[in-house]
Amino acid sequence: MYLEQLKEVNPLTICITNNVVKNFTANGLLALGASPAMSECIEDLEDLLKVADALLINIGTLTKESWQLYQEAIKIANKNQVPVVLDPVAAGASRFRLEVSLDLLKNYSISLLRGNGSEIAALIGEKQASKGADGGKVADLESIAVKANQVFDVPVVVTGETDAIAVRGEVRLLQNGSPLMPLVTGTGCLLGAVLAAFIGSSDRSDDLACLTEAMTVYNVAGEIAEKVAKGKGVGSFQVAFLDALSQMKSEMIMDK
């Protein structure tokens, strides 16, 4: 349902994301059926966000200048009622990253918070091991998702071996995906953009259902890619993953 709607709407998804993943993110969105724009010029965004369907803010390659860009872009998105997805990459790795993430969450309207366990744990003040964007192992992603949902009053997606989605106090746990996905730089960052595209093309009447389908589509594509690339390595997996995203249909996830 939501995937077909995305393909029909072809949502314009503005991605202010990190320098490492821009190409992969744009290609992933195109494969799925969305329309990516990677602009980082405020004068440009003033017009683009009037017609955009979603905005992704990914703080991966953070600078003082980019912090100001995030703030200005979110202000414009909020003014135009464009949903904003925040990916607080490595929020627990430095005080500066934590400060920026909390500023954006507390002072602007964010539609979805997406991160791994250690990133979201850092935002709610829980001590967890963090190794940059990959994060450390977190025992209870469900409780972290629930608490973050309560603290920030925003839908939350926490990714790990089991993914947790929390919306208005309701939680859903998902276990699809491939162990090869974390071995390709940008799969987590692309996920943030994919979630933005799904939200941006929906009517927002049931975020939990929308996010559940988005996560399942993404993770099942990873499973398909793993089978295709078996014995070939992570380079082949990356290509197979983009291929799988381009071929996904809702019926492929009916029993997942």
UniProtKB/Swiss-Prot annotation:
Substrate binds at residues 38, 186. It is an enzyme of class 2 (transferase). Pathway: Cofactor biosynthesis; thiamine diphosphate biosynthesis; 4-methyl-5-(2-phosphoethyl)-thiazole from 5-(2-hydroxyethyl)-4-methylthiazole: step 1/1. GO terms for molecular function: ATP binding; hydroxyethylthiazole kinase activity; magnesium ion binding. Its EC number is 2.7.1.50. It comes from the Bacteria. Its cofactor is Mg(2+). Keywords: ATP-binding, Kinase, Magnesium, Metal-binding, Nucleotide-binding, Thiamine biosynthesis, Transferase. Gene3D superfamilies: 3.40.1190.20. It catalyses: 5-(2-hydroxyethyl)-4-methylthiazole + ATP = 4-methyl-5-(2-phosphooxyethyl)-thiazole + ADP + H(+). GO terms for biological process: thiamine biosynthetic process; thiamine diphosphate biosynthetic process. This is Hydroxyethylthiazole kinase. It comes from Streptococcus agalactiae serotype Ia (strain ATCC 27591 / A909 / CDC SS700).
